[in-house]
Amino acid sequence: MRSSRSAKVSLVGAGNIGGALAHMLGASQVVKELVLVDVAGGMTEGKVLDVGQALALLGSDVYITGGSDYAAIEHSDAVVVTAGIPRKEGMSREDLLNTNAAVVRNIAENIAKYSPGALVIVVTNPLDAMVWCMYKYSGLPANRVVGMAGVLDSARFSFFLARHMNVSVSSVSAMVLGGHGDLMLPLLRYSTVGGVPVESLIESGRLNRGDIAAIVERTRKGGEEIVKLLKTGSAYCAPAASCAHMLESYVRDKRSIMPCSAYLDGQYGVRDLFVGVPVIIGEKGVEEVVEFPLTAEEQAVFDQSVELIRGSVSAIS
């Protein structure tokens, strides 16, 4: 992969997340070139102009282009996929699965054609099933396909916990495993505040289990809460920031440990599925799956999450 000074990143899907991510990457100058691709070509070109002009004010020379032609993603170092449709009223879970699976399949085939050496970060929901689709239809190696979910879920958990304890969020380190949904598993033993495990804070009386249970539940419903408040949209700043965090570790070979939807081949007792687990992200993509010992209770919740993902994958026709 090229260095961050010459790295090219393509964003497939120029909606709110794609636009916010383009601005973040351009402002931080983590990459040299950005490409936005979307079926709505005119909208994409307008967003390119808007973001590009914002970057001019910031003194950023990141080169940004866009349109509807997939050929523009050729020779990308990384491709972020946000394209897809949200679940609409009257649409079944299976409808959403198969509609977005078709979208992801088309994107996967174009990535295989134009950028087979890229790292692909999938954001499209239902997340874990869509990452599996990308892997299946692109033919890319497993270490080059990953889903963004755990970074976002962990950020939400950290935010809520920091607010509750009235401390800097920089003092909080959280780890969330499992699928991107109601069965995500925040690991309290591996989550810390000021280096002190949350479990120890509970035992010392600084936190109580009722408060933590409420924070966990709010984290699980974090996306839904934002949708209800916005009424006409969904979260995009935090998902974009989560993608930027992953991309920085990849482009700069930082080898940061973060929870992502990654391919499991026996780790955590799971095979041939993409599930949210801690991984090391470096210049080769997913360089290692980090296995944390789980208690029987944690393993049970994790297994439920895995079965839900397996059911989603099986439902794709």
UniProtKB/Swiss-Prot annotation:
Domain of life: Bacteria
Database matches in InterPro entries: L-lactate/malate_DH, Lactate/malate_DH_C, Lactate/malate_DH_N, Lactate_DH/Glyco_Ohase_4_C, Malate_DH_type3, NAD(P)-bd_dom_sf
A Pfam cross-reference name: Ldh_1_C
Residues that hold substrate according to the record: R87, R93, N125, R156
Ligand binding (NAD(+)): G13, A14, G15, N16, I17, G18, D38, N100, V123, T124, N125
Enzyme class: oxidoreductase
Record flagged with keyword NAD: yes
Gene Ontology MF term list: L-lactate dehydrogenase activity; L-malate dehydrogenase (NAD+) activity
Family annotation (Gene3D superfamilies): Lactate dehydrogenase/glycoside hydrolase, family 4, C-terminal, NAD(P)-binding Rossmann-like Domain
Catalytic site positions: H180
Keyword Oxidoreductase in annotation: yes
Reaction(s) catalysed (UniProt annotation): (S)-malate + NAD(+) = oxaloacetate + NADH + H(+)
Keywords, comma-separated and alphabetical: NAD, Oxidoreductase, Tricarboxylic acid cycle
EC number: 1.1.1.37
Family that this chain belongs to: Belongs to the LDH/MDH superfamily. MDH type 3 family.
Biological role: Catalyzes the reversible oxidation of malate to oxaloacetate.
Protein name: Malate dehydrogenase
Organism listed in the record: Anaplasma marginale (strain Florida)
